[in-house]
């Protein structure tokens, strides 16, 4: 019998696990305007900028470590 997927599995915290790009960065790359992103995610401007900066730093660290980067698409409507 196949086990259900566990999002808290320790293997997902492995330093070799693929990096998943944060939603704020994916939204920015698809062309969402900052004001629209802030409204959808209920963030202030400084919060949004901090999250984008953290996402970029994490993605750069994953790239330097040679980890694959999973950058799922976001549909802009």
From Swiss-Prot:
Xref: InterPro entries: Gp68
The name this protein goes by in its record: Gene 68 protein
């Amino acid at each position: 019998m196949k086990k259900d997927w566990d999002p808290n599995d320790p293997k997902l915290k492995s330093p070799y696990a693929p990096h998943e790009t944060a939603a704020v960065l994916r939204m920015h790359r698809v062309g969402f305007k900052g004001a629209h992103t802030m409204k959808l995610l209920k963030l202030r401007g400084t919060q949004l900028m901090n999250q984008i900066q953290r996402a970029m730093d994490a993605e750069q660290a994953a790239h330097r470590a040679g980890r694959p980067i999973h950058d799922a698409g976001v549909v802009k409507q």
